[in-house]
Regions:
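NAD(P)H-binding glycine-rich loop region in Rossmannoid oxidoreductase-like domains
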Residues: 39-76
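N-terminal Rossmann NAD(P)H-binding glycine-rich loop of SDR-like oxidoreductase domains
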Residues: 2-21
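Conserved catalytic-core motifs of eukaryotic protein kinase domains, centered on the activation segment
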Residues: 64-71, 108-112, 156-157
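SDR active-site strand-loop-helix element
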Residues: 6, 29, 54-58, 97-103, ...
Length: 158
């Protein structure tokens, strides 16, 4: 089984690479290796790698930067995700896409755990752009959306 990870330079992407490197054939792309906003580049790399699973973690997670530059947030988080989805559809419909989203799409917090049936009401540009990414991912037959909260570890200061 071959796994391709986008966002491999991030906290979660690098951890996934480290955890699975001895078990699976896993390839990671950082933002320097793959510009998800460039559809031709995305299509070419997915076609070349021909993975069974794509774990799509490439995103702009800097909330302040997203608020200050809505286009940048949407380009990476929504259009970049759309490019991944379209490349999957063009290359191999059997690829499973795992999309790393955010619990922030729910909006204001609540006192009990969220479920996939809870209504979404994102309040920030970052979370709105992640929700747009989720909508695109749902055009695939084989996908998993993981909505993470705050992530800690890996020597990264928060």
């Amino acid at each position: 089984m071959k796994i391709l990870v986008t966002g491999a330079g991030g906290l979660l992407g690098s951890t996934i690479l480290s955890l699975f490197k001895d078990t699976y054939h896993i390839v990671g792309y950082t933002r320097n290796d793959l510009d998800v906003v460039d559809y031709k580049e995305v299509q070419k790399k997915i076609s070349f790698e021909n993975p069974d699973i794509i774990i799509h973690g490439a995103a702009n997670t800097n909330a302040e930067e997203c608020e200050g530059n809505k286009n940048l947030a949407y380009n990476v988080n929504a259009i970049g995700t759309e490019n991944i989805v379209n490349a999957v559809l063009q290359n191999n419909k059997n690829i499973v896409l795992v999309y790393l989203s955010s619990t922030g799409i729910y909006g204001a917090g609540k006192n009990s755990p969220y479920t996939e049936y809870d209504p979404v009401s994102p309040t920030t540009v970052h979370h709105k752009s992640k929700l747009e990414g989720e909508k695109v991912v749902q055009n695939l037959n084989k996908y998993l959306i993981i909505r993470t909260g705050w992530l800690f570890g890996g020597g990264v200061k928060h």
